[in-house]
Amino acid sequence: MKRLLLAVAGLLARLWGVLPAGLRRRLLFGLFVLEGRAGNPKRGLSNLFGIEQALDLAINERAMAYGGAEHPKHRLTRYHDFFVERVPDGARVLDVGCGYGAVARSVARARRQATVLGVEIDAGRLAQAQTADNPPNLSFAAADATRALPPGPWDVVMLSNVLEHLEGRMGFLRDVLATARPQRVLIRVPLFERDWKMALRREVGANYMSDPEHFIEHTLAEFAAETAAAGLRIEAQTTLWGEIWADCRPVGI
């Protein structure tokens, strides 16, 4: 079915491409204007925000194709450096919700004496992580991190775009601290305050999450409150590329 849909999309794209680029853009803009004027301004804004979200999905799909199955954001935002720079060589590192293993791979390559384990619940992502060109100090395992984690102690726990996918975040973080017993927890989450349109999206009732599987996209205040309630102290934090990057320690360490 997917192959058929892609074939149909390819055919339609070729037909659409026959039209001059300027005409295509004017037609699309005209449709957006009409959609924004369907109903009152609040409804029109909600409609346009829905289109913007769909366009973001299309852009991300093309970005993955452009990047050869790896999203260019890894290269352009250099967020991997945030994790690499905070992992000492020789450390035991647990990457929770490692996805395709991109961050874990960067850390393992840069810190050859470290031992890095990535855990992931999604079988497809895990398989891709395991079959990539991985250094010998990196391994992957299947795990539902909300139910069981590899026991510690781990020197560093990495949570890159994980917390926003969880409803019981504070309980999860407490479990991580109790089971993994880390000295340091490195966290990356999307920031709600990245754009004024996020607040307007919420105000008009449009979706303001960057992923339909997100339960939250933190404000700075929410992130500070949740980490503190879980028993973490923020040692250093930066906001960049619409995200919060935080270097945390368990309280008492």
Predicted feature residues:
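Conserved class I S-adenosyl-L-methionine
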Residues: 186-208
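A short glycine-rich, Lys/Arg-flanked "PGG" loop and its adjoining helix->strand segment in the class I
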Residues: 171-184
